[in-house]
Amino acid sequence: SLEANTGNKLYIQDDLRGKNVDAIKALAAEKKVSISWTPKKTLSDMTGGAVHQGFVLRVSEFAYSELSVIMDKAEQEENPLILILDGLNDPHNFGSILRTADATQVTGVIIPKHRAVGVTPVVAKTSTGAVEHIPIARVTNLSQTLDKLKEAGFWVFGTDMDGTPSHKWNTAGKVALIIGNEGKGISANIKKQVDEMITIPMSGHVQSLNASVAAAVLMYEVYRNRL
């Protein structure tokens, strides 16, 4: 985040010393970010108890992308994959999904404005910086957005217990993949717009995978088929 020019104040643990600290101080000076030496307990309070390693960067409000920017980017790619998160609530899941999305060259991510997690400091940290590299659009109406994607030639896929096994999934062309809410899955009105449901074959005792793990398996399936 410091490299990406999104920070406006850096808090460093007041008893921290070493080469890493010197390097980060130099980068902060280069980026014109002010530094505040802060007690460890205060840093822990600021991060809600999350691991901070002695550094907390206050960032400007996240700059979301326009849907049109993601769709224009998709037009430049041979086999674009757009990820749609339908009502995801856990910031750790969101951050983890973004991290995998960056690794698998996902074109862009679309999330709803309401009843879903947005890009928060926890999301940014869990994504290990991926938020700076993937366009993320926030839309008011997910259903209308799916209509626009279909008009642009995208096939819309969802995840469900009953569907085409992921290893038999035809991922050619323009792919829009919907990942549902952690508990309820894909909402009923959105399900109606799905062209094909995909299921991840499982042989164990549990019935489902964590949302970020399921998303990762399917993103890698698309990525593998492009290699």
Language model features by range: what are they?
Residues N89-S96, N141, L209-A214:
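Amphipathic alpha-helical repeat scaffolds
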Residues K125-T128, A188-L227:
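Structured adenosyl-cofactor binding patch, chiefly the S-adenosyl-L-methionine
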Residues A116-V122, K184-Q193:
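Short, glycine/polar-rich helix-capping loops at beta-to-alpha or helix-loop-helix junctions
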Residues S1-D72:
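N-terminal positively charged helical leader segments and presequences
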Residues T107-M161:
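Histidine/lysine/aspartate-rich catalytic loop segments that bind and position anionic ligands
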Residues Q13, P39, D86, P112-K113, ...:
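Short beta->alpha connector loops at strand-helix junctions that form conserved
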Residues P80-T128:
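Hydrophobic, well-structured mid-protein blocks that either form specific transmembrane helices
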